[in-house]
């Protein structure tokens, strides 16, 4: 049976050090068009999600991650130890499954960029063309990862700087020049438009995109154990991350919102739309650079998708290690890639992609359903995280931990309940059709989302119920936790949701 090796970690991670290894999560360029559809109120949504959801998740996860014996294993360990192994298995499964669906909006963004580069609109508009192209890209990227992940983190680092950070900086700079020139602005930015119109429920649906942008912080919580002064530095690091996310996402989203009217924003290609308008206004003689920027964005998101293919499956591998999955899922190739888990995830992605792209028309509705489905699946894991934390506070107050949410039991419960209620609110509004989906499409939106969610929701519980867990998974594999001292180069440029939590050690070789 696979085993886990505990490695000593020097407690030398500072506030800025922790911020640096977590900061990659605040850049979400492919979500900017969705943010922009809410106009100036996107700032309100970012503040709401940051204060009422991101901070509670970060604080609750950090305390659970520092309980003696729970330092490794993440959500699986925390939920298993508070609610039981069935729920722990479900929680980590939802984290694995949401990645499978989360690939779809990212692939749509890639196709949007590629359609601009090749001047081939059908690639972003025709469902069949879109489906075939997305499947080819997905499986081609997967093939690059089956050979091992030795260079994945380095590729992600280059992709982050050249394909995400640089285009985002150019977008913001062009938008600033556009605004300074006195060009017409598509939105109003004042105290009235700061708040969304709460009388229109459809306007609140976009909140799910903002929640998605904050998801994944719990994956970095284990590094709290490496901090020299977690009680002081960790809450400050969370505040810094929230401020950085709000500032960058606000500027990025508003750069699109003030240039493209909300009802004209293409969620897959909105960034390229914006670059086209900005460049034609600021420097029409070099409008060809839009295709260069599109290529950078394309490479950035391709690198991101590639880096997400193996990491979550390695995280899920801990369940195969504990024989909560059939033995076939414990299979590793010679390069340390859990091939059955990876292929299973990509098969789910492929099936969902085919259904959503062709049933939803391959347009904004497909993008929105994929986005909402990703969020509601992941929220199921967060429900368990918050409930597990409440159980920890009420039933296990004496368990030793190195970080405590300051303020005592009452404050801890308030933080967890606020996070849980915000999760429930986001979950409910996810099933409401957005304002830009009208007529018969609203019924199709709800039906597709509900049916898809129920199918995915049932998978972990069915698998847990039918699998005989009495045997042992004889894998001959050792898991060595990754920390800030032994992490591979470029590891922390990956989004926390995409990082492998441990090395795979086989035949004395570390992968």
Swiss-Prot record:
The chain crosses the membrane at residues 14-36, 41-64, 86-112, 127-147, 152-180, 202-225, 230-259, 289-322, 338-359, 363-396, 410-430, 444-467. It is found in: Cell inner membrane. InterPro entries: AA/rel_permease1, APC_superfamily, Glu_antiport. It catalyses: 4-aminobutanoate(in) + L-glutamate(out) = 4-aminobutanoate(out) + L-glutamate(in). Changing residue 497 to A: Allows substrate transport at pH 6.5. It comes from the Bacteria. Changing residue 218 to A: At least 90% decrease in substrate transport. It is a multi-pass membrane protein. Its main location: membrane. Contains a unique C-terminal C-plug that plays an important role in substrate transport. The C-plug forms a folded domain and completely blocks the path to the putative substrate-binding site. Under neutral or basic pH, the C-plug probably remains closed and prevents substrate transport. At acidic pH, the C-plug may be displaced, allowing influx of Glu and efflux of GABA. Monomer. Involved in glutaminase-dependent acid resistance. Exchanges extracellular glutamate (Glu) for intracellular gamma-aminobutyric acid (GABA) under acidic conditions. The protonation states of substrates are crucial for transport. Selectively transports Glu with no net charge and GABA with a positive charge. Also efficiently transports glutamine and, to a smaller extent, methionine and leucine. When the extracellular pH drops below 2.5, can import L-glutamine and export either glutamate or GABA. Belongs to the amino acid-polyamine-organocation (APC) superfamily. Glutamate:GABA antiporter (GGA) (TC 2.A.3.7) family. This is Glutamate/gamma-aminobutyrate antiporter. It comes from Escherichia coli (strain K12). The gene is gadC.
